[in-house]
Design a protein with these regions (language model features):
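Conserved acidic carboxylate
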Residues: 18
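Two-component/phosphorelay signaling modules centered on CheY-like receiver
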Residues: 21-39
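Acidic, metal-coordinating helix/loop segments flanking the phosphotransfer/catalytic sites
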Residues: 39-58
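Receiver (REC) domain active-site loop signature in two-component systems and cognate sites
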Residues: 65
């Protein structure tokens, strides 16, 4: 559990799921300004973390990944009674209107298209956290 040194509040736990190692660490640096960040390289690794007791406040996931993609992860979470309430932000290069609709229907609360600005991602994560409260 991480504590904000300025406010004394507990920082939210953010799970970032991304197969591109460079982008994964860049996203971690961005989101570390607002929360405690845990990383997974694909949907299977994320699901393993979640099923072994890790409880994030929000998940940020890429859509296209090996082993288990973000869409399958979102659908799996949505169908799981214990994990279905976790807010999910999709972060992906697939930015067409139908891609966004598919992501939202799969369980994502927000959709961020790559390339993206740090402020846009942080804004969507904050909105997902607020909606969860």
């Amino acid at each position: 559990m991480a504590i904000d040194p300025v406010t004394g509040h507990v920082l939210p736990k953010i799970l970032v799921v991304e197969d591109d190692a460079d982008l994964l660490h860049m996203i971690k640096a961005m989101l570390a300004t607002i929360g405690e960040v845990t990383l997974a390289k694909d949907g299977m690794e994320a699901l393993d973390l979640l099923r072994t007791g890790f409880k994030p406040d929000v998940i940020v996931t890429d859509l296209m990944m090996p082993r288990m993609d973000g869409l399958t992860l979102a659908k799996t979470l949505k169908d799981d009674p214990q994990l279905g309430n976790l807010p999910l932000v999709m972060l992906t290069a697939k930015s067409g209107p139908m891609d966004m609709i598919t992501g939202i229907n799969a369980g994502a609360r927000h959709y961020v298209a790559k390339p993206f600005k740090a402020a846009d991602l942080i804004d969507k994560v904050k909105k997902a956290l607020i909606a969860r409260r």
